[in-house]
Amino acid sequence: MIEVTEWDLKALFRSEEQLERFMSSLKRNARQFAKAYEGKLSEIKSQDFCAVIREYEEILEGIGRVMTYVFLGFAKDSTQGDVYAKYEMQTTQIHNLVLFFELEFCKLSQNQQKECIESSPQYAYFLQKLIEQDE
């Protein structure tokens, strides 16, 4: 007998309605982030950089939360492929809105990158990996 795994997905979202509200908020936050910082990353003072990357992290964590929820729902019921595809497309669109952050960070001067890393030590590993991947 095959044992079916049951996940309690309520830790992520209690309902589809909550998921939809979260997605709306996530899209709005990503648009605001892009409006505030796209093309302007080089102008951000190093002491303000930590707050900017924290916003970026929150958006990425939101994407991860949504995709974890829909993936586990799909794993439980593979007839839900349309739901998975819907949210995968939406989260990809959200990620595309904020992708500039990584690209622009890699284009900063080495001195600016160093200052940003020093002002955001909790993100040093992530930022250093971005630089290494860009080389």
Pin down the residues of each PLM region.
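A well-structured
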Residues: 1-135
